[in-house]
Design a protein with these regions (language model features):
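Short, charged/small-residue-rich alpha-helical element at the C-terminal edge
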Residues: 238-309, 313-314, 318, 324
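Catalytic Walker B motif of ABC-type/P-loop ATPase nucleotide-binding domains
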Residues: 173-177
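Helical segment within the ABC ATPase nucleotide-binding domain
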Residues: 188-201
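Conserved ABC ATPase "signature" region
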Residues: 112, 116-119, 124-144
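Helix-to-loop junction immediately C-terminal to a conserved catalytic motif
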Residues: 64
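ABC ATPase "signature
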Residues: 233-234
Length: 324
């Protein structure tokens, strides 16, 4: 299946998939976004993190064209989302946290019904929609293609959500808490799917999640939104190196386990001394701060500097309904 995806991969388009400059949003007298700026290249996987009320949902809805902004410049796939037409929207995929649908739909029938919308917007470079049976195979639902939606398990149901979001072979996919309710096996398979979309289809992915381990595994870059602005932008390793000061060195000598905390964040000198002074060291490992540690440090710094909790007031109930 990966070879088929590679063969059909659309060519790289010029310019970033997302370009946001000084994005601002105000609800009444409350400023939710106070100057958000970032860009995403084609085929990049970004995770947008932040505490509840930080403005994540508002940001995503503006990028999707579902909410008007107060100020700032936004370009998504080369167009202003506020002026995006149906042809532009057909290039986007949205995987919501929940989807209300008619329980009598069968998997193949539902995807076939939705796929028809995208047919007029296919091009030579990007044929649309995705072949339904191929898509069902990609998301791991071949054995369940003729089942009614109500018969699917939670993990299978979430795979269908993903299939619904990408049936039009989008160039940009928005994922909202994509693996909520997944068991570990289903989560790993979903991660593989996201990587295949980015690597073989050159699909840009912007995901929001509260699962920091998932963000660390999936994202090429991590954005942290707090107080209405981006307070960090980089890989998990870059953020840990820049924002946390402690690393942990663990080793074994004579069957006894030892642990040492390095406060300056660079354990290289300590490890060299350790190995030079004791040749019997085994099971040596260095643990840097986790993304969770880094994230908590960032949020604490941002809220302390701002003198207030994260901006609130955004609406977060994002659902869609399909009628039979």
């Amino acid at each position: 299946m990966e070879s088929a995806m590679r063969a059909q991969a659309p060519p790289t388009s010029p310019g970033p998939a997302i370009d946001v400059r000084d994005l601002r949003m105000r609800y009444g007298t409350k400023d939710v976004l106070t100057g958000v700026s970032f860009a995403a290249r084609r085929g990049e996987v970004l995770a947008l993190l932040g505490p509840n009320g930080a403005g994540k949902t508002t940001t995503i809805e503006i990028l999707e064209g579902f909410r008007m902004r107060s100020a700032g410049e936004v370009s998504v796939l080369g167009q202003d989302p506020a002026r995006g037409d149906e042809a532009w929207r057909a290039r986007l995929g949205v995987v919501l946290q929940s989807w209300r649908d008619h329980s009598r739909w069968r998997v193949r029938d539902l995807l076939g019904y939705l796929a028809r919308f995208y047919a007029p917007y296919g091009t030579t470079d990007v044929p649309r929609p995705w072949d339904v049976d191929e898509l069902i195979d990609v998301v791991g639902l071949t054995e369940h293609a003729d089942l009614k939606v109500q018969k699917l398990s939670g993990g299978q149901r979430r795979r269908l959500d993903v299939a619904i979001g990408i049936v039009g072979r989008p160039e940009l996919v928005f994922l909202d808490e994509p693996t909520a309710g997944f068991d570990p096996h289903a989560r790993r398979e979903f991660h593989d799917l996201v990587h295949r979309l980015a690597d073989f289809e050159n699909t840009t992915v912007l995901l929001t999640t509260h699962d920091l381990d998932e963000a660390e595994k999936l994202a090429d870059r991590i954005l942290v939104l707090d107080g209405g602005t981006i307070v960090a932008d980089g890989t998990a390793d870059q953020l840990a190196r820049e924002l946390t000061t402690q690393a942990e060195v663990r080793w074994t000598v004579g069957g006894r386990r030892h642990v040492h905390a390095v406060e300056d964040g660079d354990p290289t000198a300590f490890v060299r001394r350790l190995l030079a002074n004791d040749p019997d060291v085994t099971e040596l490992e260095v643990r840097r701060a986790s993304l969770e540690d880094t994230y908590m440090t960032l949020v604490h710094r941002a809220e302390t500097a701002g003198g207030r909790p994260s901006a609130g007031g955004e609406q977060t109930d994002r659902t869609e309904e399909v009628q039979a």
